Amino acid sequence: MEMEEERKQDETWVQVAEGRWRRLTRRDFLKSAAAGAAAGSLGPLVLTERTRAQPVTLRILQWRHFVPPYDEWFNKVFAPKWGEKNGVRVVVENVGLAEIPAIAASEAARVAAGADPGHDMIQYLTPPATLERQVDTDAHREVIEELKRKVGPYIPLAEKSTYNPVTRRYFGVSDNFVPDPIHYRADLWRQVSARLTGDQRVPLLGPITWEDIRKAGRELKRMGHPVGLGLSQEIDTGMWLRALMYSWGTGEQDEAGNVILDVPPFRQRTLDALRFVKALYEETMFPGVFAWTAASNNEEFLAGRISIAANAISIARTAQAMAAAAIRRGENPNQSPAVQFARNTWITERAPRGPAGARGLEHVMGVYFIWRNRPRPVREAAKKLLIDLVLSYDPDVAAREGWPPGKFHASQAYDYPTFQNAISKQKRLAYLRDDPVAKAAGDRKDKLATIETAYEWAHNVGWPGPSSAAIDEVFNTWIINVMFARVAQGIDTPEQALDAAAAQIRRVFQKWREQGLVGGRR
């Protein structure tokens, strides 16, 4: 052990090309340097030991944020200023949300082959548990432990979304989750609420239950503004359908990782959920939901075509941005269509309630991971950036470090901290109850403050079990989405769709059990 430690101490990381490093002993390094000097006429020496004059390059891949000011802050303020302060050249590439899984899969294959992946760190938007063997689980653990020491607990939602209890390893670090309330047109909802009576009555101030959405949705569809909940092979569909399943008291697995959706008593609950979604589609929606993309919620709602969507607050924020632009153009807030639209774009206080409770998910789950084959200087830079990014939630910390306004304000409260005390509840609510974005739009200044309740109702993908490699594959191969869509379209009966999906899910779980990454027995 002592000899091994001495060997490691004698080694140094050497950059051999852009993004490529090699670990050499001091003796090997000096030999290479001498050889390069002897062949000086052949060109410059390639092997260069890292010095302060030659900063580490840290390559990050992440999504194009649905609140554009966040990318402006991260790319033009946080990353360059953090890099300057820490002697790191930070290169950020932003791509569409749907592009990330394919890029990550390609890079994972390169890591497995011992090659440079192309990026050093990637931000995923669902728990990337299938990549556990290609990522630096020790680095992730070190980041999480340091953040716990600095700011306190890592919320259970994040723990279940990044930690594998079977291997006892962290396959990622979650810096944020994005609450997923129901957005609805308050003006249209009030009209419907006034019209419905008796057992069809719905609350005046928006839906509380899934049945409220079904009842009101029938009228909203007749008015030309149907419900817009995707039934396609994309992330938002996967999230809201699981929220509904969990609210019906069923799901893919139990806490131990056993597949349960077709096992009594869960089988009947799953069938009931399938029948409900079929009725919800037929009575309240339109065929376009079968071609939904991650942008459709925003596009269809903001165009005025749909009246209800399950979405992060980016819908409300975009409506407010359009309203603020109208006010800057000189429009009267009390007459401006854009301002009125923003004022009538509301969110529910909680996830809709089903027979078993009000259980929601997150719209996206922000999880960063570092590839396992990154050299020590890059690894250390990635760890420090993640720690400082989480600490920047606090606007006072961000201002002191030189990258204001910080993560929470830059995202306009879209990114909610998984280290809950990175920004105190008092500071979160101070922002949300006197919201500068809402005020600039002529909107009610505290309208989005209810998003704080998401800590009480947001659940992880795969609840009540962990977000395992099997859950990751089931989610990203859209097995649940297809099951519900085939029933809604009348292609399969609920029983046929459930049996087919359960068989697929069991094969996925068995594959990952055989690799030692998933628990459970059936």
Positions of predicted regions on the chain:
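Short, solvent-exposed loop/beta-turn-alpha elements that line the ligand-binding surface or hinge
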Residues: R141-Y154, P203-G206, T250-D272, N332-F341, ...
